[in-house]
């Protein structure tokens, strides 16, 4: 069987609908027995010797002509894993759900006729840039320079915890160059709120408490410290510029969501976050890492992979807090996916 390429679509004649769509989920019917398939679908049929050519072209020529090599790598991999999938093209099945996607992948055992989508997949090369605002409810299929595939699931994920907050009032605090010190009445802050760190070390049972500027600003706003919030924020801006305001907005939002954020420095992130907390003496592992980014941030796939790999390696989720100048936050969770 020879296909015909016209206006970016390959037309297959004869009994193509019965052979390729009705039984195996390729293309879209056009009436009768004929079938329209996308170039990547035609390339897959060529690779299986299910059709003889497209306008006399074999697989090599078709991929070069249509520029679908990366799409073919992903399409074939998902087919090999047992999925039926459709290209996200106008007029193809499920296209209403296909914004920012290249393929719609159906649950195993289902196809385009069932109306159920398992994954919305976008194909990305290793060196392409990825606007963070374009992510969420889509799976990234990243093809590296060797042709290997890595899948990342991206979805909105508002933080939520069970940590109760019980703050003291008007504790004396001393504002330093990059932190604050609280000398008296610190047990309630530290033991029951996990604010700060003991100046004498994490294993100390007593002594003054050192607070990050983020913690100090948050506590000053809540009148737990007898210092001016504006002074703390000004000091924070001196230390890290406007980024301090974004990080403070995220810190406050995490606390308001009944989670406990702490420094994520050791994990290369802004925060590590505990969703369950009762006391420092009964501390569990943190559940996810947070990196604060601007809404117009652009990822390089290699950096995204590094963040997600590191989080997964320590059994945590990677969450990005897209934070604008007004402190509005959209949350994005990214994790490795094996389809």
Curated annotation (Swiss-Prot):
Pfam families: tRNA_int_endo (PF01974), tRNA_int_endo_N (PF02778). CDD domains: tRNA-intron_lyase_C. Divalent cations; Ca(2+) better than Mg(2+). It comes from the Archaea. Homodimer. The N-terminus is blocked. Its cofactor is Ca(2+); Mg(2+). InterPro entries: tRNA_endonuc-like_dom_sf, tRNA_intron_Endo_cat-like_sf, tRNA_intron_Endonuc_cat-like, tRNA_intron_Endonuc_N, tRNA_intron_Endonuc_N_sf, tRNA_splic, tRNA_splic_arch_long. It catalyses: pretRNA = a 3'-half-tRNA molecule with a 5'-OH end + a 5'-half-tRNA molecule with a 2',3'-cyclic phosphate end + an intron with a 2',3'-cyclic phosphate and a 5'-hydroxyl terminus. Optimum pH is 6.5-8.5. Its EC number is 4.6.1.16. Keywords: Lyase, tRNA processing. Endonuclease that removes tRNA introns. Cleaves pre-tRNA at the 5'- and 3'-splice sites to release the intron. The products are an intron and two tRNA half-molecules bearing 2',3' cyclic phosphate and 5'-OH termini. Recognizes a pseudosymmetric substrate in which 2 bulged loops of 3 bases are separated by a stem of 4 bp. Belongs to the tRNA-intron endonuclease family. Archaeal long subfamily. This is tRNA-splicing endonuclease. The keyword Signal does not apply. The active site is at 274, 285, 316. GO terms for cellular component: cytoplasm. GO terms for molecular function: lyase activity; nucleic acid binding; tRNA-intron endonuclease activity. GO terms for biological process: tRNA splicing, via endonucleolytic cleavage and ligation.
